[in-house]
Amino acid sequence: MRLTLLLEMAAKLKLPHDYRFGMSRPSTLAAKRRNPPGKRRSKVFVEPVSKEEWQYFRGDTVEVLHGKDAGKQGKVTQVVRARNWVVVDGLNTHFRYVGRTDEYRGTYVASEGPLLLNQVSLIDPTDRKPTEIEWRYTEEGERVRVSARSGRIIPKPVLQRRDGIIPEQWKDGPKDTSVEDALERTYVPSLKTFQEEIMEKTGIAENRRHRKSYWY
């Protein structure tokens, strides 16, 4: 585990109760522009889905059930649990201009729009067709997703962080800080100033005597 991951775990972003989640992460500039301080936005009602019953994860292969791309399959690239959204790579796309100004018309790019959970379905590995799933436990006690039609286990995709690192496959390099080194207590409290500590470490002896000072 890297030191940056430990710092991310320690930092918790506090959001107002009426915050409206979108495609951008709350800490990004785009999300802050859509949720400026003091602005109240209408509430968006979302069907609650518990963490234990959530079925879709980044890297899953799903099939679109409704819309212009119905019947097409793709890989989930983003999950927004606060809105019951999933984003599928290359599907449900719309085109827009990015970076438009008065002097420049901008760049015309394709952007994937979000899909609700009831608009997609997981793929059965047996026949590559959409299927409902159930959460069950294996003999080893592992909780897995099982196809309701064929009984085949649908494995969860390997977790990949936003920086492209897969924790299970990561190997610390010479420049990575280990967990033991990050958690080791090396600071020793002292009443000495920083300059006095440096002098003690380098063996500098102070022979000068402080002059008397007078206050009037």
Swiss-Prot record:
InterPro entries: KOW, Rib_uL2_dom2, Ribosomal_uL24, Ribosomal_uL24_CS, Ribosomal_uL24_KOW, Translation_prot_SH3-like_sf. One of its GO terms (molecular function) is structural constituent of ribosome. SMART domains: KOW. GO terms for cellular component: mitochondrial large ribosomal subunit; mitochondrion. Residues 56-89 form the KOW domain. The keyword Transit peptide applies. Keywords: Mitochondrion, Ribonucleoprotein, Ribosomal protein, Transit peptide. PROSITE patterns: RIBOSOMAL_L24 (PS01108). It is found in: Mitochondrion. Ubiquitous. Expressed at greater levels in the kidney, adipose tissue, muscle and liver than the brain, heart, ovary and lung. It comes from the Eukaryota. Residues 1-9 form a transit peptide. GO terms for biological process: translation. PANTHER family: MITOCHONDRIAL RIBOSOMAL PROTEIN L24. Component of the mitochondrial ribosome large subunit (39S) which comprises a 16S rRNA and about 50 distinct proteins. Belongs to the universal ribosomal protein uL24 family. This is Large ribosomal subunit protein uL24m. It comes from Xenopus laevis (African clawed frog). The lineage of its organism: Eukaryota, Metazoa, Chordata, Craniata, Vertebrata. The gene is mrpl24.
